[in-house]
Amino acid sequence: MVLARPDAVFAPARNRCHVSLPVNAMSLKMKVCNHVIMRHHHMHGRRYGRPGGWQQAQQPDASGAAEWFAGRLPEDWFDGDPTVIVDREEITVIGKLPGLESPEEESAARASGRVSRFRDETRPERMTIADEAQNRYGRKVSWGVEVGGERILFTHIAVPVMTRLKQPERQVLDTLVDAGVARSRSDALAWSVKLVGEHTEEWLAKLRTAMSAVDDLRAQGPDLPA
């Protein structure tokens, strides 16, 4: 029979960490308990976002996406190479549908019918190409077409954007909602961003080019002497 040590008084099973130990074993007990606490905090502690900011080095390089789609898409889908727009979450591919000999004679209803036909007939192959592109570039793929001078986007992703607005900024959104321009603050914010983008496209394009150059330099790293 194994007898318990006379200097050890055990607590109930549900509270086994609270054990009376001799002085020479107390330091070991403290180390074990601290290790368990630190391990629990590490496993379940809060993590704030991902490291770093917006860097292309954290995602697959998509600088060649336009050329890849131009070579991958069937040649009879579009009139010329498609327009490929890339951001952190999504790649949007927009191609111009082959037009009629007299585009000015095409009615809006006929153009809409051609868009619907293209969308239905190409859906399986577009899904396959989108999967390939997602594996290659780490981004979702959306589609759109141009017909009769109008750009039509198919279903594409909506990414939530967390932000904090002060009262004057919230009042701007509430005014747009109250005036019926938008249904909610979220819609009003999206409308405002779209409006700014339309009126500052040239400046935004220059800014994106500059940011892309900075990201390329960051990914390349410095040239250190041998």
From Swiss-Prot:
It comes from the Bacteria. GO terms for cellular component: peptidoglycan-based cell wall; plasma membrane. This is Uncharacterized protein Rv1265. It comes from Mycobacterium tuberculosis (strain ATCC 25618 / H37Rv).
